[in-house]
Amino acid sequence: MQTTYRKLTKNKKIALVAHDHCKQDLIQWCQTNRTLLQPHILYATGTTGNLIHQETNLEIKNLLSGPMGGDQQLGGLIAEGKIDLLIFFWDPMNAVPHDPDVKALMRIATVWNIPVAMNIATADFLISSPAFQQETEIRIPDYQGYLKERLK
């Protein structure tokens, strides 16, 4: 597949998601990194976003809760180029009813090559990267080229 580049601005659009058993870890991580997160545009699935806002006072654009379609909403935003990175603390020890949605979200994040952190260590590495604080580019699929090929 052909690729092109997408610019990520200095102020990133960050999606925050956590399974129930991981919500407190994500809230604590957001509290610890509040100063670093504040200048960015933050999105979250419903319950997670409300809890983060209550505990940190960070401004959050809340979507639906994951099981009610929030993971799917995030996937759509990623495909539209409206999310720059995903912080998703998921619980590998417990299945959730919306596992297919979670898998679809991870797949679409990979297709569109956005940085994904699935645990505290990776999230710490991601936000300590120089690219987090500056404008950068990521390579993404060239959808127009893909469509042109498919329509031949």
From Swiss-Prot:
Residues 6-152 form the MGS-like domain. The keyword Protein biosynthesis does not apply. One of its GO terms (molecular function) is methylglyoxal synthase activity. Pfam families: MGS (PF02142). It catalyses: dihydroxyacetone phosphate = methylglyoxal + phosphate. The active site is at residue 71. SUPFAM superfamilies: Methylglyoxal synthase-like. Gene3D superfamilies: Methylglyoxal synthase-like domain (3.40.50.1380). Its EC number is 4.2.3.3. Substrate binds at residues 19, 23, 45-48, 65-66, 98. It is an enzyme of class 4 (lyase). GO terms for biological process: methylglyoxal biosynthetic process. Keywords: Lyase. The keyword Lyase applies. GO terms for cellular component: cytosol. Catalyzes the formation of methylglyoxal from dihydroxyacetone phosphate. Belongs to the methylglyoxal synthase family. HAMAP family: Methylglyoxal_synth (MF_00549). This is Methylglyoxal synthase. It comes from Histophilus somni (strain 129Pt) (Haemophilus somnus). The gene is mgsA.
